């Protein structure tokens, strides 16, 4: 696989509940039909209280993540305060759209974070289209995961319930999607909060 970009066919989920954003992603990357890495982090910390999930070409996603970090750092240095989640989302949308006709970045992004205006979750596709959502799923397993979210999401979910729902959505996608698997990384972002945890699948979950 030397010289080839690894394609991350995956499932990522984002949920807004109360003052928090919950992001979740499976832990496997693939190249074609081959499992390239059994455990891969697909939730990238961008700023103190902002993170991004990635699906698509890993190399492209890494470039976008570095640009997001640069934008956040530059904003903080110049203005002395953290960038708003919406402002960062708009910047990433512009970047993706600008490269569309030249060499498009093959990525789908969920940008989640907390700022003075509360929790936010933005979906950004490879065309640079941008939308703010209460819940969303991306990646090869997203149809299944989104179905779970649509059926079970409520605005009054507790934080623990939201974490369980995110895990359930990714787990359901894993049962149907051979490109997602191994376990789930979960990140919770809220007021003065950035917490990472990992839940590995039991054999009964990943068994066909």
From Swiss-Prot:
InterPro entries: Ntn_hydrolases_N, Pept_T1A_Psome_bsu_arc, Pept_T1A_subB, Proteasome_bsu_CS, Proteasome_sua/b, Proteasome_suB-type. GO terms for molecular function: threonine-type endopeptidase activity. Pfam families: Proteasome. GO terms for biological process: proteasomal protein catabolic process. It catalyses: Cleavage of peptide bonds with very broad specificity. The formation of the proteasomal ATPase PAN-20S proteasome complex, via the docking of the C-termini of PAN into the intersubunit pockets in the alpha-rings, triggers opening of the gate for substrate entry. Interconversion between the open-gate and close-gate conformations leads to a dynamic regulation of the 20S proteasome proteolysis activity. Residues 1-9 form a propeptide. GO terms for cellular component: cytoplasm; proteasome core complex, beta-subunit complex. SUPFAM superfamilies: N-terminal nucleophile aminohydrolases (Ntn hydrolases) (SSF56235). The keyword Signal does not apply. The active site is at residue 10. It is found in: Cytoplasm. Keywords: Autocatalytic cleavage, Cytoplasm, Hydrolase, Protease, Proteasome, Threonine protease, Zymogen. Its EC number is 3.4.25.1. The 20S proteasome core is composed of 14 alpha and 14 beta subunits that assemble into four stacked heptameric rings, resulting in a barrel-shaped structure. The two inner rings, each composed of seven catalytic beta subunits, are sandwiched by two outer rings, each composed of seven alpha subunits. The catalytic chamber with the active sites is on the inside of the barrel. Has a gated structure, the ends of the cylinder being occluded by the N-termini of the alpha-subunits. Is capped at one or both ends by the proteasome regulatory ATPase, PAN. Component of the proteasome core, a large protease complex with broad specificity involved in protein degradation. Belongs to the peptidase T1B family. This is Proteasome subunit beta 2. It comes from Staphylothermus marinus (strain ATCC 43588 / DSM 3639 / JCM 9404 / F1).
